[in-house]
Amino acid sequence: MLIYKDIFTDDELSSDSFPMKLVDDLVYEFKGKHVVRKEGEIVLAGSNPSAEEGAEDDGSDEHVERGIDIVLNHKLVEMNCYEDASMFKAYIKKFMKNVIDHMEKNNRDKADVDAFKKKIQGWVVSLLAKDRFKNLAFFIGERAAEGAENGQVAIIEYRDVDGTEVPTLMLVKEAIIEEKC
C-alpha cells in the first residue's frame, strides 16, 4: 500500500486504498465515502464490514464515529477557519511559496517550477469561485493540528456522482511524498 504524506509535516493525508486519479499532473483526487463505524476501527476500501462478525448494532455503549472514511482513517482535523475566503487566500499564498521554494531547493527544472506556478494559480482561482468555494471543507493532519507549520490543507469537495454525494479529497502533488508501507 502507498501512503501519501505531507512533505512539510510528515502527516499521513491519504493512501492508495481509496479510488484516486491525478488531475492535470497537479492534484491527486481521492474518492471517499460517508461511513459509520466503531471508534478507532479502520476499514480499508473494498472490505465488507457487514460480513464481519459483530457488525450489527448490539445495543452496547460503544462509541461510534461518523464521517468521511479518508478523514477518519488518517485522523485529519477539520479547519473551519479556512471557510473564510480571505483566510484561505492568505494560507494558499504562503503554501504555494513554500512548495515553490521546496521545488527550487531540490533543483527542479525551471520549466517544471514555472508550469507548476501556472497550474496552481489556475486551480486556486477555480476553487475560489463562489459557487464552488462554499462547497469545500478543509482538513489538516495531526502534526499540523499540533502546531507544525507549512502543512498542506487537504480540501474536500462534495461532488454529485450519479445522484450520490461523493466527498473528493484533493492534495497538491508537489507537496506530498509517496511512501510504501
Swiss-Prot record:
InterPro entries: Mss4-like_sf (IPR011057), Mss4/transl-control_tumour (IPR011323), TCTP (IPR034737), Translation_control_tumour_CS (IPR018103), Translational_control_tumour_p (IPR018105)
Limits of the TCTP domain: 1-181
Pfam families: TCTP
Superkingdom of origin: Eukaryota
GO cellular component, one term: endoplasmic reticulum
A GO MF label: calcium ion binding
UniProt cross-references to Gene3D superfamilies, sorted A to Z: Metal Binding Protein, Guanine Nucleotide Exchange Factor, Chain A
Keyword Zinc-finger: no
Keyword line: Calcium, Cytoplasm
SUPFAM superfamilies: Mss4-like (SSF51316)
Principal subcellular localization: cytoplasm
Family, similarity comment: Belongs to the TCTP family.
Role description: Involved in calcium binding and microtubule stabilization.
Protein name (Swiss-Prot/TrEMBL): Translationally-controlled tumor protein homolog
Lineage, highest ranks first: Eukaryota, Metazoa, Ecdysozoa, Nematoda, Chromadorea
